[in-house]
Amino acid sequence: MKKALKILAVALLLAATVIPVQAQRRVVHYLPKYEQEPYHFGFLLAFNEMMYTVKTVENYQNKIQPANSWPVVNWPTQLFTQSETKCIYVYNIETQQTPGFTVGIIGSKRLGRYFDLRFIPSLSFSERRLDYTLMLEGNNGATYMHKFTKSIGTTFVEFPLNIKYRSKRYNNIGAYVFGGVNPKLDLASQKDNKENINGQEFINNLVTKRFDFAAELGVGFDFYNQWFKMGIEVKMSYGLLDIVKDEAFIYTAPIEKLRNKLFQVSFLFE
């Protein structure tokens, strides 16, 4: 999110320098009838930060994970082997923010003097990460804390539909807020999560459900020039569905609900 905020800060700084300059001289009003046109089209380029919102099972740290749910590859310690392991606990689970990017096509319909309906089919690329800490206890009484990260690659096909409310235009600048919904499909969510070891299949990754439905809110600024309008906006997107697939596995056992969350800085050209 820090990188996205830096990009936003630079964009707002540029906007802050443009406004005083326009106020000090006679301004040519570009695209004066732009808002009166019924339809507008364009494209979007964006930087995003994807993450999860994790709701854990109550007292999950005290629950022993069954042996058939243990990871069987890259056994983390030489203090004792898997067969010498007495039990494993999931000690902690946290989510990481990861950067990505989005491209999309903009379709906008005028609903009224200050209202627009926008449809922006998009492709978003990133990954989500979960940090796990396992506590292993051997039959000999030794314990070992193992930390590792599970990365889930993500390619979202998104269909955001939102209502945009515009302020009154000031010279060649306008502000707006928007809100709406975003059905999305994760093309990478069904990636194979099994590994074959000595003829047996073992689960070795976290897999999420393919479909999600999100609510979105955001704010932005429109900048008009001679040939087109450029917008800079930020939005938060909150997944409404639980996307975890419970496969009786140590990576999913402590998770009661898992939801998508996204922060995005967008540049729109119409």
Question: Where are the regions that the model predicts?
Answer:
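Structural signature of outer-membrane beta-barrel domains
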Residues: 48-52, 124-128, 182-188, 237-243, ...
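Extracellular loop and loop/strand-boundary signature of outer-membrane beta-barrel proteins
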Residues: 28-30, 88-93, 143-150, 201-207, ...
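Predominantly the C-terminal beta-signal and adjacent terminal strand-loop region
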Residues: 210-215, 221-270
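Residues on the lipid-exposed face of transmembrane beta-strands in outer-membrane beta-barrel proteins
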Residues: 43-47, 101-109, 121-123, 157-165, ...
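Outer-membrane beta-barrel channels and translocator barrels
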Residues: 36, 112-114, 168-172, 224-226, ...
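Residues that define the transmembrane beta-barrel architecture of outer-membrane proteins
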Residues: 37-41, 97-101, 153-157, 173, ...
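Outer-membrane beta-barrel translocator domains and adjoining extracellular loop/strand segments
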Residues: 54-60, 130-136, 188-197, 243-250
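Short glycine/proline- and aromatic-enriched beta-strand/turn motifs that initiate or cap beta-hairpins
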Residues: 23-99, 270
